Design a protein with these regions (language model features):
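N-terminal secretory signal peptides that target proteins for export/translocation
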Residues: 1-26
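Signal peptide processing junction and immediate N-terminal pro/mature segment
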Residues: 42-50
């Protein structure tokens, strides 16, 4: 706008105008815009207005139902093919609780055992919209890193197809006393195995496909997620809907 061009907003800010009440229409529009900005629900993995990942609250886990234990054991299997369909929030909440949730709130103990109750295993959720840490106490996902890092969670091609991979990471800084006895570090593998089996049994009960692996590009994945030296990637386990089986060709000889 040149100096000679009249400013269309000049007269709005005169002393007289500032004393006038705001027209009802303008007030309603302003309040509506503000309400939308505050209350608009963000989709899982959505970014904040500043462009950063935000914590994702999970629905309360449903801890009843499911198949009988012996039936789930009979259905437990490893899969290497996954449909790309996203896992619903309720199913994800149930899965995470079954894997490593708090089943005794009074003392914070979990659904899987932990040597000396170190609770040194962190369960991370790797998805297309980012990587998140399962905060069992708050029942939410805390952002770890933006971006799709599923391809780094294994060396097989299928790892990038599953809608999510659960990453089991040991935080050795919680293992008080283990620094005096290095053999106690071996417990991290047992503790991770307990959680992995919980994941298997939940998936068997819910008709989901899952597969665990230890073959992971640990240095690349740790760098991508910004992990510290005391955080050790142990296992990764993909979860998703099973791929529908293709019926045999009746004309096949």
């Amino acid at each position: 706008m040149s100096p000679l061009t009249p400013n269309p907003f000049y007269n709005l800010y005169t002393e007289d105008n500032l004393k006038k009440p705001i027209p009802n229409t303008m007030l309603r529009v302003a309040m509506s815009v503000l309400a939308v900005m505050i209350l608009w629900p963000m989709a899982p993995g959505a970014r904040s207005w500043a462009g950063e990942l935000v914590p994702i609250p999970l629905p309360p886990p449903q801890t009843d139902g499911g198949k009988p234990l012996m039936q789930a054991l009979g259905l437990r299997a490893t899969s290497r093919a996954f449909a790309p369909d996203p896992i619903p929030a309720q199913t994800l909440s149930n899965l995470l609780w079954a894997a490593w949730g708090i089943n005794r709130p009074a003392d914070g103990k979990r659904t899987a055992p932990s040597a000396r109750n170190w609770q040194e295993i962190d369960l991370m959720v790797v998805r297309a919209d980012g990587t998140f840490h399962y905060d069992a106490a708050a029942n939410r996902l805390r952002p770890v890193a933006a971006g799709d890092h599923r391809a780094l969670t294994g060396v097989q091609p299928f790892v990038k197809d599953a809608p999510l991979t659960l990453l089991l990471v040991a935080d050795t800084s919680r293992m008080k006393g283990a620094e005096k006895d290095p053999d106690q570090r071996q417990w991290i593998w047992a503790d991770a195995g307990f959680i992995s089996q919980n994941i298997y049994l939940f998936c068997a009960s819910e008709g989901l496909a899952t597969g665990v692996r230890a073959l992971v590009d640990r240095p690349a994945l740790a760098k991508a997620l910004g992990l510290k030296e005391h955080q050790i990637i142990l296992l990764s386990q993909s979860v998703g809907r099973p791929v529908a089986s293709i019926p045999d060709n009746p004309n096949k000889k």
